[in-house]
């Protein structure tokens, strides 16, 4: 008995009963085929029932979850209290989904294993050629009368084989040519040479397509603007709703619904309204009370950082006849607290010779004004008045004028001396001791400078004395 081929995608196979068999042989083949058909059908229906039961169990689980959620919703419908619902950001599903599997996965064909051998005792009938010819009249015989197979064989390798598992096995290596449809001789250097039917070689080659309208009519295509697909948050126009603060006895609305600031940051572009924390108030009552009690007890607490010593008072200026300095008052003696265990004579000597800041350290809050007051104020600073300084300058100028006019008493000499002094004052030069008794500037440059008229003098207090000299 010849072996029957089965399609590779099928899980089961059934043998066919061959014609022209002996009676006993035909009965055995029919019996074996029907038994195998019964086994295959039972296996198929059992797999279908198993898949139906699996889907039914899954549907029951989904219905159970649905009924539970529906019961929770029904319980929350009559409640008038605010309820927080936390939604998971991740979909409630397993990390790896279960792949679909066919119901015939793992099915095995047991026909080859269950094939039995039977011993036939009857003999074959002699061959009758006339009977064979008569059977050809009644049984259809497929005869290919067209020559399409020959033409297709010339174009390609023929029909596709059954053992092709991938596209790479179908196409030529590193190309897109299907050799079963069109045979191609590939040369990497010379290009692709195609072997075709000799009858088709006389046909005209395909013409190129017409050029587009943008080239033939010289039209320019409009450049399309690129669309922006980025997410741009926008609140838009928020409607203003005027409703009362509380709406009691409404169906499906909670009565104790309150909004607080701990809902988290808002979404863009709204600005996060974070309240500024209030700083604690600072009071100095406790500090002042503690400092007063410490002073009453005679104890001074040292400051945390050592304060820098105040600057020493400026040295007194030289005494003048106009403002004699007043004697400084004696420093106030502060009695030091007596120690319980006695004091060392070496320590007393060091304390007596040390400055006041070292003996009694300050609390680090001494200011410049306090140091000025301790120095004696205006009375001990030996300060001079501005008016007294002006009077002294005026007297010095008068003495210089008297010394300059001592050489001659005529009008021309006085005028010459005045002009020389005025030019020196404008130029900023101070006359030396020997120049005060001289006759005046000499030389060509000095004579030229004498011809230049002097600048008008500024309005000063000494101008009245000059006018008096002119009038005299």
UniProtKB/Swiss-Prot annotation:
Residues 1-51 are annotated as: Required for WASH complex assembly. It comes from the Eukaryota. Residues 385-400 have a biased composition (Basic and acidic residues). Residues 352-472 are annotated as: VCA. One of its GO terms (cellular component) is cytosol. InterPro entries: WASH1, WASH1_WAHD. GO terms for biological process: Arp2/3 complex-mediated actin nucleation; endocytic recycling; endosomal transport; exocytosis; protein transport; retrograde transport, endosome to Golgi. The keyword Signal does not apply. Residues 301-334 have a biased composition (Pro residues). Keywords: Actin-binding, Endosome, Membrane, Protein transport, Transport. The VCA (verprolin, cofilin, acidic) domain promotes actin polymerization by the Arp2/3 complex in vitro. Belongs to the WASH1 family. This is WASH complex subunit 1. It comes from Xenopus laevis (African clawed frog).
């Amino acid at each position: 008995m010849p072996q029957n081929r089965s399609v590779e995608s099928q899980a089961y196979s059934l043998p066919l009963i061959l014609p022209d068999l002996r009676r006993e042989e035909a009965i055995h083949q029919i019996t074996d085929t029907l038994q195998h058909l019964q086994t295959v059908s039972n296996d198929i229906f059992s797999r279908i029932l198993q898949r139906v039961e699996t889907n039914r169990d899954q549907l029951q689980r989904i219905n159970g979850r649905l009924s539970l959620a529906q019961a929770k919703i029904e319980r929350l419908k009559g409640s008038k209290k605010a309820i927080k619902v936390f939604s998971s950001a991740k979909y409630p599903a397993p990390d790896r989904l279960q792949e679909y599997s066919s119901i015939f996965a793992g099915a095995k064909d047991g026909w080859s294993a269950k094939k039995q051998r039977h011993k036939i005792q009857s003999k074959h009938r002699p061959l009758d050629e006339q009977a064979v010819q008569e059977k050809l009249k009644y049984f259809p015989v497929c005869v290919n009368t067209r020559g399409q197979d020959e033409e297709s064989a010339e174009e390609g390798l023929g029909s596709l084989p059954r053992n092709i598992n991938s596209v790479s096995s179908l196409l030529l290596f590193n190309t897109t040519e299907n050799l079963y449809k069109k045979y191609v001789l590939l040369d990497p250097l010379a290009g692709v040479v195609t072997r075709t039917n000799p009858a088709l070689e006389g046909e005209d080659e395909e013409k190129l397509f017409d050029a587009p309208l943008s080239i033939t009519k010289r039209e320019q295509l409009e450049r399309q603007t690129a669309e922006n697909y980025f997410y741009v948050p926008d609140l838009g126009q928020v409607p203003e709703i005027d409703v009362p603060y509380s709406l009691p006895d409404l169906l499906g609305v909670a009565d104790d619904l309150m909004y607080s600031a701990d809902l988290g940051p808002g979404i863009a572009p709204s600005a996060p309204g974070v309240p500024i924390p209030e700083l604690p108030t600072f009071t100095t009552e406790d500090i002042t009370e503690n400092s007063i009690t410490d002073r009453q007890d005679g104890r001074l607490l040292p400051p945390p950082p050592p304060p820098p010593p105040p600057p020493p008072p400026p040295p007194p200026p030289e005494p003048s006849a106009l403002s004699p300095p007043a004697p400084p008052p004696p420093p106030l003696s502060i009695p030091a607290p007596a120690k319980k265990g006695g004091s060392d004579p070496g320590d007393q000597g060091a304390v007596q010779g040390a400055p006041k800041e070292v003996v009694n350290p300050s609390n680090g809050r001494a200011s410049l004004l306090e140091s000025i007051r301790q120095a004696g104020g205006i009375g001990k600073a030996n300060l001079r008045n501005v008016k007294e300084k002006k009077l002294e300058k005026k007297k010095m100028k008068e003495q210089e004028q008297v010394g300059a006019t001592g050489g001659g008493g005529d009008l021309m000499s006085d005028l010459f001396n005045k002009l020389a002094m005025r030019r020196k004052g404008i130029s900023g030069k101070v006359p030396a001791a020997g120049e005060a008794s001289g006759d005046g500037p000499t030389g060509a440059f000095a004579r030229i400078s004498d011809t230049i008229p002097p600048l008008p003098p500024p309005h000063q207090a000494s101008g009245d004395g000059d006018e008096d000299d002119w009038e005299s």
